[in-house]
Amino acid sequence: MSTLNNSVLAISPARESKVRKLSEVSHHKTMDHATVLPWDQDIDRSLYPKDPEHLWINGTRYCEGLSDAQKLELAWLETGRDISMFIWLEQTIPPLYMGYITQFHDRISPDLQEYLMIFSKEEIVHTLTFKRFMAKAGLKIWNPPVGLYELLTQTLPKMEPAVGVLFTLLIEWVAEMGAMHTSQGAAVEPMTRTLFREHHYDEARHIAFGRWISESFFETASRESIDQVKAMSRKIIPALIDMFTYNPEIALHTSFEFPIAVDDKAKIEEVWRSPNNARLNDARFTEIYAWIDKLGLRQ
């Protein structure tokens, strides 16, 4: 493990060597805001930005009777939600991680401090890029995700860094796998497909880093700390999956009367538990479910 006295990010030499490799890759190839997309070209809103089979209410009675134009509108709104989720998450990570470096500068190894800085820099570029895409596509940024935004801005800054890394990993991993699962088909609007693909190159490194830090935490932390984190996870993970699966706020954004009111808890629950969404979540979150179950985070 890290030889730093009283380290707050204990990690094995083998894993720390892998983190150094992540830094090297990031220094040589990372998202460039100016060139990642052909900004002089239009975004084609007549094409789907995601697989239409993955619409939140697809396979439920609430999707029946919707016109093709309404389904296309929903697809763009849902993509706007996905990007908004990234924006709210990724602009909270830099102050969180830089705060850890400032507070624990003598208890985090130089290699890990460097990657936390790189991670933060990349998230700022992602946020700028997502905001520019949203404006170009004529999409509005959705409200901050209820509960998760408070977790990131109020709760995690007061907890030890490894716990902050774990929960940012869980949120980012769910959002990333969800976006990639639906956006990479050949029929998807080209600018949207490219945006998510290019974003994924950086995010794959972020996810690897988060996994290594989190796994090290569960190998070295006290039983009391582990039990506390597991208790938090068992509350947060189901809420996170539900939030990604269907966000009731969509009823406030449609140009037509949406079949589910923003406060209709029974219908919202029905969509969350629909067989179609259960199958979809099992497919897109297979890797995440296997990892969190191995660590006992949702049992």
Which residues are covered by each model-predicted region?
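Short glycine/serine- and small hydrophobic-enriched flexible loop segments
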Residues: 99, 181-184, 215
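Active-site-proximal alpha-helical scaffolds that flank and shape metal-associated catalytic sites
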Residues: 132-204, 228-239
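Extended, well-ordered alpha-helical scaffold segments
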Residues: 112-119, 195, 199
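Alpha-helical transition-metal enzyme core signature, strongest for iron centers
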Residues: 86-94, 119-130, 134, 168-179, ...
